[in-house]
């Protein structure tokens, strides 16, 4: 099983188009050693031929151009993407669906019932796509695993996360199970597992159990401190209020990652443009390295 990181940044990417925080300004000026990043998305395959796209970011066309394995060129119109899985209904995880409207058949799309509701009403992307390629909608169960037709070698199992519904959703600040999910990906031959959760606001027992059972965790790296956006004047909300567990501080992501088995590969994804870990020379980045934690980058491949 291979997992390719198509995009590793949070919403807005890095640098964000209208942001002049130390990271974004420094990257543009060449005074900060960092990589540009597109918005969060991954793709997974069990046979190097048939892939599942997780989330469709606004940067999806750029991401696909930079992933030649997703364009096998077997016909005039072709793609290696057999299905799309949405882990939530956030703008930065769904807008790219509109850019994929030229498909010659309905996209096989998997999402939970709350996500389907939001993308049919508050942000009716599903209705819009009905006038183009259309969608073959499949509901993701919140208990037990599921298989995706045409994608051999990979098993999928979702679990609900405590995070937040999108700002446009009537459930904003009062989310229900299924508004956000994490997914365990299992190589059906080796049994090795990767746990994927780019939006994780609270460590609950069932989430912790899934992380402990995984050989690799690819998890929320949005913000370093809980008040990061407030201190910069970029937002009035804390990291946790936005549905993201900060890396540092009591009960932060680093504390949890430290408790995983030494053999577990630990990778952060969905990194906000303000997060100091993007600066490869920052003390925060050095602290991650000391804890054995990696920072995902666009084009990174995880093999299990």
From Swiss-Prot:
Keywords: PQQ biosynthesis, Transport
Signal peptide: none
Gene name tied to this protein: pqqB
Function: May be involved in the transport of PQQ or its precursor to the periplasm.
InterPro entries: Metallo-B-lactamas, PQQ_synth_PqqB, RibonucZ/Hydroxyglut_hydro
Biological processes annotated in GO: pyrroloquinoline quinone biosynthetic process
Protein name: Coenzyme PQQ synthesis protein B
Superkingdom of the source species: Bacteria
Protein family membership: Belongs to the PqqB family.
Protein's pathway: Cofactor biosynthesis; pyrroloquinoline quinone biosynthesis
